[in-house]
A protein has these predicted regions:
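A short beta-strand micro-motif common to beta-rich folds, especially ectodomain repeats
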Residues: 1-8, 94-106
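Low-complexity/repetitive intrinsically disordered segments
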Residues: 1-27, 188-193
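Low-complexity "stalk/linker" and mucin-like segments enriched in Ser/Thr/Pro/Ala/Gly
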Residues: 68-83, 139, 167-192
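Solvent-exposed, low-complexity, repeat-rich "mucin-like" stalks and linkers
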Residues: 12-16, 20-21, 25-70, 118, ...
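Extracellular and select intracellular beta-sandwich modules with Ser/Thr-enriched
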Residues: 8-13, 106-112
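Residues on the solvent-exposed faces and adjacent turns
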Residues: 6, 17, 89, 104, ...
Length: 193
């Protein structure tokens, strides 16, 4: 209210300002992962996500409003607890990935976490184990034959990505060379006469 006064007389007038208008900008949603690639043997990645929008007074940005978006997404081999993504040992020769989506106020954003392909890690071969047997083990005095059976095997252990307990054992077979000694015997292939 403005008052004008002169010679004992006065007059007033009032100026009114309209109420301020509060409006909001669109939500801006972001989500990132660090790291974006996890080793084949397993590990973790941390998600960072947020939702922000401008608050405007009479069309002028005066502050921002923040919120926590909803995060969704799943894939085999991955688990999420809050912002922590855990990848299990990848027992596959292919890489794998999971995509997470952060959503709030009708807006969304995505990020992808990838796990490297798995590979088999081998130990050293064991020494060869050689066995030989004859059937029969006794030949009549009049002569006859015996069949010789021989084998050679060796083993080694393996794991996926060096993670203990994730693999197994494999074996390899060989063919031993046969020879015979002793008077009165001949060996042809696996037949002893």
């Amino acid at each position: 209210t403005v008052t004008a006064t002169h010679a004992g007389k006065s007059a007033t007038c009032t100026v009114t300002q309209s109420a301020g208008e509060i409006t909001y900008g669109a939500w801006k949603v972001t989500i990132t992962a660090n790291p974006t690639t996890i080793a084949a043997a397993g590990g973790t990645s941390t998600l960072t996500y947020s939702a922000v929008r401008d608050v405007l007074t009479n069309g002028v940005v005066t502050s921002t409003e923040k919120a926590t978006p909803t995060v969704s997404g799943s894939a085999t081999g991955f688990t999420r607890s809050g912002a922590t993504v855990t990848a299990a040992n990848n027992t596959s020769a292919s890489s794998r990935s999971v995509t997470y989506t952060a959503t709030h106020g009708g807006k969304s954003a995505t990020c992808t976490v990838t796990q490297s392909a798995g590979s088999k890690q081998y130990g050293s071969w064991s020494a060869w184990t050689v066995s030989v047997s004859a059937n029969p083990t006794t030949i009549a005095r009049t002569g006859g034959t015996s069949t010789i059976t021989a084998s050679a095997t060796r083993t080694r252990t393996w794991t996926w990505n060096g993670v203990s307990g994730s693999g197994g054992t494999e074996s390899e077979k060989g063919t031993p060379a046969l020879s015979a000694s002793g008077s009165g015997f001949t060996l042809s292939g696996t037949t002893l006469t």
